[in-house]
Protein backbone atom coordinates (compact mmCIF):
# COMPACT_ATOMS: atom_id res chain seq x y z
CA UNK A 1 0.00 0.00 0.00
CA UNK A 2 0.98 3.62 -0.40
CA UNK A 3 2.78 5.21 2.52
CA UNK A 4 0.52 7.33 4.76
CA UNK A 5 1.43 10.99 5.20
CA UNK A 6 -1.54 13.13 6.24
CA UNK A 7 -5.23 13.67 5.70
CA UNK A 8 -6.73 15.98 3.11
CA UNK A 9 -10.18 16.70 1.72
CA UNK A 10 -11.36 16.88 -1.88
CA UNK A 11 -14.44 19.10 -1.76
CA UNK A 12 -16.17 17.10 0.93
CA UNK A 13 -14.77 13.67 0.08
CA UNK A 14 -12.14 12.68 2.63
CA UNK A 15 -9.12 10.75 1.44
CA UNK A 16 -5.80 9.96 3.06
CA UNK A 17 -2.84 11.78 1.62
CA UNK A 18 -0.19 9.39 0.40
CA UNK A 19 3.23 9.78 -1.16
CA UNK A 20 1.53 8.21 -4.16
CA UNK A 21 -2.19 8.37 -4.78
CA UNK A 22 -3.03 5.14 -6.55
CA UNK A 23 -6.02 4.97 -8.89
CA UNK A 24 -7.33 1.84 -10.57
CA UNK A 25 -9.10 2.71 -13.83
CA UNK A 26 -11.68 0.23 -15.14
CA UNK A 27 -12.56 -0.35 -18.79
CA UNK A 28 -14.76 -3.13 -20.10
CA UNK A 29 -15.40 -2.26 -23.74
CA UNK A 30 -13.95 -0.17 -26.56
CA UNK A 31 -16.09 2.93 -25.78
CA UNK A 32 -14.73 2.86 -22.22
CA UNK A 33 -11.17 3.20 -23.49
CA UNK A 34 -12.22 6.12 -25.67
CA UNK A 35 -13.58 7.79 -22.53
CA UNK A 36 -10.67 7.03 -20.23
CA UNK A 37 -7.98 8.08 -22.73
CA UNK A 38 -8.16 11.80 -21.80
CA UNK A 39 -8.16 10.89 -18.10
CA UNK A 40 -4.91 8.99 -18.58
CA UNK A 41 -3.49 11.96 -20.50
CA UNK A 42 -4.49 14.29 -17.66
CA UNK A 43 -2.81 12.02 -15.12
CA UNK A 44 0.36 11.91 -17.21
CA UNK A 45 0.33 15.71 -17.43
CA UNK A 46 0.19 16.22 -13.66
CA UNK A 47 2.79 13.49 -13.16
CA UNK A 48 5.12 15.50 -15.40
CA UNK A 49 4.36 18.52 -13.21
CA UNK A 50 5.57 16.60 -10.16
CA UNK A 51 2.26 15.43 -8.70
CA UNK A 52 2.45 12.06 -6.99
CA UNK A 53 -0.32 10.09 -8.61
CA UNK A 54 -0.18 6.66 -10.19
CA UNK A 55 -2.73 4.57 -12.05
CA UNK A 56 -3.31 0.96 -13.04
CA UNK A 57 -5.44 0.27 -16.11
CA UNK A 58 -7.65 -2.81 -15.81
CA UNK A 59 -9.49 -4.24 -18.82
CA UNK A 60 -12.17 -6.66 -17.65
CA UNK A 61 -12.39 -8.23 -21.10
CA UNK A 62 -16.17 -7.82 -21.02
CA UNK A 63 -16.41 -7.24 -24.77
CA UNK A 64 -14.10 -8.82 -27.29
CA UNK A 65 -13.52 -6.33 -30.07
CA UNK A 66 -11.41 -7.12 -33.12
CA UNK A 67 -10.79 -3.39 -33.56
CA UNK A 68 -8.97 -3.26 -30.21
CA UNK A 69 -5.57 -4.05 -31.65
CA UNK A 70 -2.28 -2.51 -30.65
CA UNK A 71 -3.02 0.19 -33.23
CA UNK A 72 -6.18 1.16 -31.34
CA UNK A 73 -4.19 2.04 -28.23
CA UNK A 74 -1.57 3.84 -30.31
CA UNK A 75 -4.29 5.95 -31.95
CA UNK A 76 -5.65 6.96 -28.55
CA UNK A 77 -2.09 7.48 -27.30
CA UNK A 78 -2.62 5.34 -24.22
CA UNK A 79 -0.73 2.27 -22.98
CA UNK A 80 -2.00 -1.27 -23.23
CA UNK A 81 -3.96 -2.32 -20.11
CA UNK A 82 -1.87 -3.56 -17.21
CA UNK A 83 -4.09 -6.63 -17.08
CA UNK A 84 -6.98 -8.17 -19.01
CA UNK A 85 -9.27 -10.13 -16.70
CA UNK A 86 -10.69 -12.10 -19.64
CA UNK A 87 -14.31 -12.00 -18.51
CA UNK A 88 -16.09 -12.03 -21.86
CA UNK A 89 -19.10 -14.10 -22.86
CA UNK A 90 -21.97 -15.64 -20.92
CA UNK A 91 -25.26 -14.20 -19.78
CA UNK A 92 -25.35 -10.84 -18.04
CA UNK A 93 -25.52 -12.57 -14.67
CA UNK A 94 -22.64 -14.91 -15.51
CA UNK A 95 -20.54 -12.04 -16.81
CA UNK A 96 -21.23 -9.95 -13.71
CA UNK A 97 -20.16 -12.84 -11.50
CA UNK A 98 -17.00 -13.52 -13.52
CA UNK A 99 -15.96 -9.87 -13.40
CA UNK A 100 -16.57 -9.62 -9.66
CA UNK A 101 -14.56 -12.74 -8.89
CA UNK A 102 -11.66 -11.71 -11.13
CA UNK A 103 -11.60 -8.08 -10.02
CA UNK A 104 -11.68 -9.03 -6.35
CA UNK A 105 -8.45 -10.98 -6.85
CA UNK A 106 -6.97 -8.10 -8.85
CA UNK A 107 -7.83 -5.46 -6.25
CA UNK A 108 -6.56 -7.59 -3.37
CA UNK A 109 -3.28 -8.09 -5.25
CA UNK A 110 -3.02 -4.43 -6.28
CA UNK A 111 -4.83 -2.30 -3.67
CA UNK A 112 -5.44 1.34 -4.45
CA UNK A 113 -6.90 4.50 -2.96
CA UNK A 114 -9.65 4.92 -5.55
CA UNK A 115 -11.38 2.84 -8.23
CA UNK A 116 -12.49 5.00 -11.15
CA UNK A 117 -15.28 3.64 -13.35
CA UNK A 118 -16.83 5.17 -16.46
CA UNK A 119 -20.17 4.89 -18.18
CA UNK A 120 -22.71 2.15 -17.71
CA UNK A 121 -21.42 -1.22 -18.88
CA UNK A 122 -21.62 -4.33 -16.69
CA UNK A 123 -17.97 -3.89 -15.69
CA UNK A 124 -18.78 -0.45 -14.26
CA UNK A 125 -21.35 -1.91 -11.89
CA UNK A 126 -19.50 -5.12 -11.03
CA UNK A 127 -16.20 -3.42 -10.19
CA UNK A 128 -17.98 -0.77 -8.11
CA UNK A 129 -19.56 -3.49 -5.98
CA UNK A 130 -16.22 -5.23 -5.46
CA UNK A 131 -14.43 -1.99 -4.59
CA UNK A 132 -16.97 -1.05 -1.94
CA UNK A 133 -16.86 -4.54 -0.41
CA UNK A 134 -13.10 -4.09 -0.11
CA UNK A 135 -13.56 -0.64 1.46
CA UNK A 136 -12.12 1.23 -1.50
CA UNK A 137 -13.47 4.59 -2.68
CA UNK A 138 -15.33 4.68 -6.01
CA UNK A 139 -15.53 7.58 -8.46
CA UNK A 140 -18.08 7.39 -11.28
CA UNK A 141 -17.50 9.30 -14.51
CA UNK A 142 -20.79 10.06 -16.34
CA UNK A 143 -22.71 9.71 -13.09
CA UNK A 144 -26.37 10.62 -12.76
CA UNK A 145 -27.53 10.08 -16.33
CA UNK A 146 -30.88 8.31 -16.49
CA UNK A 147 -33.27 7.02 -19.13
CA UNK A 148 -35.67 5.78 -16.41
CA UNK A 149 -36.14 2.67 -18.55
CA UNK A 150 -35.47 -0.42 -16.46
CA UNK A 151 -35.69 -2.67 -19.52
CA UNK A 152 -32.23 -1.33 -20.41
CA UNK A 153 -29.39 -3.25 -18.71
CA UNK A 154 -27.35 -0.04 -18.80
CA UNK A 155 -29.92 1.74 -16.65
CA UNK A 156 -29.62 -0.90 -13.94
CA UNK A 157 -25.83 -0.60 -14.10
CA UNK A 158 -26.08 3.19 -13.66
CA UNK A 159 -28.44 2.95 -10.71
CA UNK A 160 -26.34 0.42 -8.80
CA UNK A 161 -23.07 2.24 -9.50
CA UNK A 162 -24.44 5.60 -8.38
CA UNK A 163 -25.86 4.02 -5.23
CA UNK A 164 -22.32 2.98 -4.26
CA UNK A 165 -20.07 5.75 -5.57
CA UNK A 166 -18.33 8.26 -3.31
CA UNK A 167 -17.51 10.81 -6.01
CA UNK A 168 -19.76 11.72 -8.93
CA UNK A 169 -18.42 13.34 -12.11
CA UNK A 170 -21.32 14.61 -14.22
CA UNK A 171 -21.93 15.77 -17.78
CA UNK A 172 -24.97 18.00 -17.23
CA UNK A 173 -27.18 19.90 -14.80
CA UNK A 174 -29.85 17.25 -15.38
CA UNK A 175 -27.47 14.59 -14.06
CA UNK A 176 -26.71 16.78 -11.04
CA UNK A 177 -30.42 17.09 -10.28
CA UNK A 178 -30.96 13.35 -10.68
CA UNK A 179 -28.22 12.60 -8.15
CA UNK A 180 -29.50 15.14 -5.64
CA UNK A 181 -33.00 13.70 -5.93
CA UNK A 182 -31.55 10.25 -5.29
CA UNK A 183 -29.87 11.38 -2.07
CA UNK A 184 -26.33 12.31 -3.09
CA UNK A 185 -24.73 15.13 -1.14
CA UNK A 186 -23.95 18.31 -3.09
CA UNK A 187 -20.28 18.12 -2.12
CA UNK A 188 -20.02 14.68 -3.75
CA UNK A 189 -21.17 15.98 -7.14
CA UNK A 190 -18.70 17.57 -9.55
CA UNK A 191 -20.06 19.00 -12.79
CA UNK A 192 -17.03 18.61 -15.03
CA UNK A 193 -18.31 18.03 -18.57
CA UNK A 194 -18.03 15.14 -21.01
CA UNK A 195 -14.85 13.05 -21.38
CA UNK A 196 -16.10 11.60 -24.69
CA UNK A 197 -15.88 15.10 -26.12
CA UNK A 198 -12.31 15.46 -24.83
CA UNK A 199 -11.34 12.51 -27.01
CA UNK A 200 -13.38 13.77 -29.96
CA UNK A 201 -11.78 17.21 -29.95
CA UNK A 202 -8.28 15.82 -29.40
CA UNK A 203 -8.63 13.62 -32.49
CA UNK A 204 -10.29 15.95 -35.01
CA UNK A 205 -7.08 16.30 -36.99
CA UNK A 206 -6.54 12.53 -36.96
CA UNK A 207 -9.89 11.52 -38.45
CA UNK A 208 -9.31 9.57 -41.65
CA UNK A 209 -11.38 8.40 -44.58
CA UNK A 210 -12.58 4.81 -44.46
CA UNK A 211 -11.19 2.70 -47.31
CA UNK A 212 -14.57 2.62 -49.06
CA UNK A 213 -15.16 6.40 -48.99
CA UNK A 214 -13.71 7.18 -52.42
CA UNK A 215 -14.73 3.91 -54.07
CA UNK A 216 -18.37 4.62 -53.18
CA UNK A 217 -17.89 8.19 -54.45
CA UNK A 218 -19.25 9.66 -51.24
CA UNK A 219 -19.56 13.43 -51.13
CA UNK A 220 -19.66 15.72 -48.12
CA UNK A 221 -23.17 16.08 -46.67
CA UNK A 222 -24.53 13.83 -49.40
CA UNK A 223 -24.88 10.55 -47.51
CA UNK A 224 -26.54 9.19 -44.36
CA UNK A 225 -24.84 7.24 -41.56
CA UNK A 226 -26.97 4.53 -39.94
CA UNK A 227 -26.33 2.50 -36.78
CA UNK A 228 -28.82 0.13 -35.15
CA UNK A 229 -28.24 -2.46 -32.45
CA UNK A 230 -30.87 -2.21 -29.70
CA UNK A 231 -33.28 -5.15 -29.32
CA UNK A 232 -36.29 -2.81 -29.61
CA UNK A 233 -35.22 -2.04 -33.18
CA UNK A 234 -33.58 -5.20 -34.50
CA UNK A 235 -35.10 -8.21 -32.76
CA UNK A 236 -38.54 -8.13 -34.41
CA UNK A 237 -38.28 -9.09 -38.08
CA UNK A 238 -41.40 -7.26 -39.24
CA UNK A 239 -40.51 -4.07 -37.39
CA UNK A 240 -36.91 -4.08 -38.62
CA UNK A 241 -38.09 -4.61 -42.19
CA UNK A 242 -40.52 -1.68 -41.86
CA UNK A 243 -37.84 0.51 -40.30
CA UNK A 244 -35.42 -0.13 -43.14
CA UNK A 245 -38.20 0.40 -45.71
CA UNK A 246 -39.01 3.82 -44.23
CA UNK A 247 -35.36 4.84 -44.11
CA UNK A 248 -34.35 3.67 -47.59
CA UNK A 249 -37.46 5.15 -49.24
CA UNK A 250 -37.20 8.59 -47.64
CA UNK A 251 -33.57 9.71 -47.97
CA UNK A 252 -33.99 11.04 -51.52
CA UNK A 253 -31.71 8.36 -52.93
CA UNK A 254 -28.69 9.35 -50.86
CA UNK A 255 -26.23 6.57 -50.01
CA UNK A 256 -26.84 5.03 -46.58
CA UNK A 257 -23.68 3.79 -44.89
CA UNK A 258 -24.43 1.16 -42.26
CA UNK A 259 -21.45 -0.09 -40.18
CA UNK A 260 -23.30 -3.11 -38.94
CA UNK A 261 -23.20 -4.62 -35.47
CA UNK A 262 -22.62 -8.42 -35.55
CA UNK A 263 -26.00 -9.19 -33.94
CA UNK A 264 -27.74 -6.98 -36.52
CA UNK A 265 -25.79 -8.50 -39.41
CA UNK A 266 -27.16 -11.93 -38.58
CA UNK A 267 -30.74 -10.66 -38.65
CA UNK A 268 -30.17 -8.81 -41.94
CA UNK A 269 -28.83 -11.96 -43.56
CA UNK A 270 -31.86 -13.93 -42.43
CA UNK A 271 -34.32 -11.31 -43.70
CA UNK A 272 -32.50 -10.49 -46.92
CA UNK A 273 -32.82 -6.74 -46.37
CA UNK A 274 -31.22 -4.68 -49.14
CA UNK A 275 -31.57 -1.55 -51.26
CA UNK A 276 -29.52 -0.14 -54.18
CA UNK A 277 -28.22 2.77 -52.09
CA UNK A 278 -27.78 0.85 -48.81
CA UNK A 279 -24.15 -0.03 -48.15
CA UNK A 280 -23.52 -2.44 -45.30
CA UNK A 281 -19.92 -2.21 -44.11
CA UNK A 282 -17.84 -3.82 -41.39
CA UNK A 283 -17.59 -2.06 -38.00
CA UNK A 284 -15.22 0.89 -38.25
CA UNK A 285 -12.42 2.12 -36.03
CA UNK A 286 -12.89 5.30 -34.00
CA UNK A 287 -11.04 7.60 -36.40
CA UNK A 288 -12.75 6.27 -39.53
CA UNK A 289 -16.23 6.28 -38.03
CA UNK A 290 -16.00 9.86 -36.82
CA UNK A 291 -14.64 11.01 -40.18
CA UNK A 292 -17.75 9.45 -41.71
CA UNK A 293 -20.03 11.19 -39.20
CA UNK A 294 -18.31 14.57 -39.43
CA UNK A 295 -18.89 14.76 -43.19
CA UNK A 296 -22.37 13.21 -43.48
CA UNK A 297 -25.76 14.88 -43.93
CA UNK A 298 -27.28 13.18 -40.89
CA UNK A 299 -27.01 10.21 -38.57
CA UNK A 300 -29.85 7.79 -37.86
CA UNK A 301 -29.09 5.77 -34.74
CA UNK A 302 -30.31 4.12 -31.57
CA UNK A 303 -27.00 4.71 -29.78
CA UNK A 304 -26.49 7.10 -26.89
CA UNK A 305 -22.86 8.12 -27.29
CA UNK A 306 -23.18 9.01 -30.96
CA UNK A 307 -25.80 11.63 -30.08
CA UNK A 308 -23.19 13.44 -27.99
CA UNK A 309 -20.64 13.44 -30.80
CA UNK A 310 -23.14 14.63 -33.42
CA UNK A 311 -24.20 17.43 -31.08
CA UNK A 312 -20.64 18.74 -30.84
CA UNK A 313 -20.00 18.29 -34.58
CA UNK A 314 -23.28 20.00 -35.46
CA UNK A 315 -24.63 17.01 -37.39
CA UNK A 316 -28.41 16.33 -37.39
CA UNK A 317 -29.17 13.14 -35.45
CA UNK A 318 -32.38 11.10 -35.61
CA UNK A 319 -32.57 8.75 -32.63
CA UNK A 320 -34.87 5.74 -32.98
CA UNK A 321 -35.65 5.46 -29.28
CA UNK A 322 -38.51 6.47 -27.00
CA UNK A 323 -36.20 7.85 -24.32
CA UNK A 324 -32.66 9.07 -23.80
CA UNK A 325 -30.29 9.27 -20.87
CA UNK A 326 -28.69 12.27 -22.58
CA UNK A 327 -31.54 14.83 -22.79
CA UNK A 328 -29.15 17.73 -23.32
CA UNK A 329 -28.46 16.38 -26.83
CA UNK A 330 -32.13 17.10 -27.57
CA UNK A 331 -32.75 20.26 -25.55
CA UNK A 332 -29.46 21.90 -26.57
CA UNK A 333 -27.90 19.79 -29.31
CA UNK A 334 -28.82 18.50 -32.76
CA UNK A 335 -30.54 15.30 -31.64
CA UNK A 336 -34.25 14.49 -31.82
CA UNK A 337 -36.02 11.44 -30.42
CA UNK A 338 -38.02 9.90 -33.25
CA UNK A 339 -39.31 6.93 -31.28
CA UNK A 340 -39.42 3.25 -32.19
CA UNK A 341 -42.48 3.42 -34.46
CA UNK A 342 -41.22 3.12 -38.06
CA UNK A 343 -44.01 5.42 -39.27
CA UNK A 344 -42.35 8.34 -37.44
CA UNK A 345 -39.25 8.10 -39.63
CA UNK A 346 -40.69 9.69 -42.80
CA UNK A 347 -41.89 12.93 -41.10
CA UNK A 348 -38.49 13.31 -39.45
CA UNK A 349 -36.62 12.81 -42.72
CA UNK A 350 -38.99 15.21 -44.50
CA UNK A 351 -38.10 17.80 -41.87
CA UNK A 352 -34.39 17.15 -42.45
CA UNK A 353 -34.56 17.42 -46.23
CA UNK A 354 -36.75 20.53 -46.14
CA UNK A 355 -33.95 22.32 -44.28
CA UNK A 356 -35.93 22.74 -41.07
CA UNK A 357 -33.70 20.74 -38.73
CA UNK A 358 -32.57 22.71 -35.71
CA UNK A 359 -29.01 24.06 -35.65
CA UNK A 360 -28.33 23.10 -32.04
CA UNK A 361 -25.64 24.23 -29.64
CA UNK A 362 -22.96 22.68 -27.44
CA UNK A 363 -23.76 21.94 -23.77
CA UNK A 364 -21.85 23.73 -21.05
CA UNK A 365 -18.38 22.36 -20.25
CA UNK A 366 -18.30 20.10 -23.32
CA UNK A 367 -15.10 21.91 -24.20
CA UNK A 368 -12.38 19.26 -24.32
CA UNK A 369 -11.05 19.90 -20.80
CA UNK A 370 -13.22 17.57 -18.72
CA UNK A 371 -10.46 15.12 -17.80
CA UNK A 372 -8.28 17.93 -16.48
CA UNK A 373 -11.11 18.99 -14.18
CA UNK A 374 -11.57 15.41 -12.98
CA UNK A 375 -7.93 15.06 -11.98
CA UNK A 376 -7.94 18.50 -10.36
CA UNK A 377 -10.84 17.40 -8.15
CA UNK A 378 -9.13 14.14 -7.21
CA UNK A 379 -5.85 15.78 -6.36
CA UNK A 380 -7.38 18.88 -4.79
CA UNK A 381 -5.23 21.61 -6.28
CA UNK A 382 -5.21 23.49 -2.97
CA UNK A 383 -3.14 20.65 -1.42
CA UNK A 384 0.33 19.62 -2.46
CA UNK A 385 1.13 15.93 -2.27
CA UNK A 386 4.34 15.18 -0.42
Q: Could you say what each language-model-derived stretch is?
A:
Residues 24-27, 32-50, 72, 84-185:
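Active-site and donor-binding regions of nucleotide-sugar-utilizing enzymes
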Residues 11-20:
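Short, Lys/Arg-enriched N-terminal segments with co-localized hydrophobic residues
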Residues 73, 174, 336-386:
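Leloir-type glycosyltransferase catalytic cores
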Residues 63-67, 86, 164-235, 338:
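A nucleotide-sugar donor-handling region in carbohydrate enzymes
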Residues 46-56, 251-256:
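A generic structural motif
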Residues 61-79:
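N-terminal beta-loop-helix "entrance" segment that forms/cooperates
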Residues 70, 208-295:
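Donor-nucleotide binding loops and adjacent catalytic segments primarily
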Residues 117-118, 129, 168, 292-330:
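A donor-sugar binding/catalytic signature common to diverse glycosyltransferases
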Amino acid sequence: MSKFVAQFSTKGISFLRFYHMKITIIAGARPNFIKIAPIIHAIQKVQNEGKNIAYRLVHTGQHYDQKMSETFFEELDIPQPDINLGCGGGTQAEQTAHIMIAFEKELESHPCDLVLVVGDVTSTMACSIVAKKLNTKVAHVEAGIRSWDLTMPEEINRMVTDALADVFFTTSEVANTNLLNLGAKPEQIHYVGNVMIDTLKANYSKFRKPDFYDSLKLQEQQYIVLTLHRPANVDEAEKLTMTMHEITNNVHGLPIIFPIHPRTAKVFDELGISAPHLYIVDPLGYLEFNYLVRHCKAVITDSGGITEETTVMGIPCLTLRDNTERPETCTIGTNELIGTNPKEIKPALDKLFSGNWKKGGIPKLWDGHTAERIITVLLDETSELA
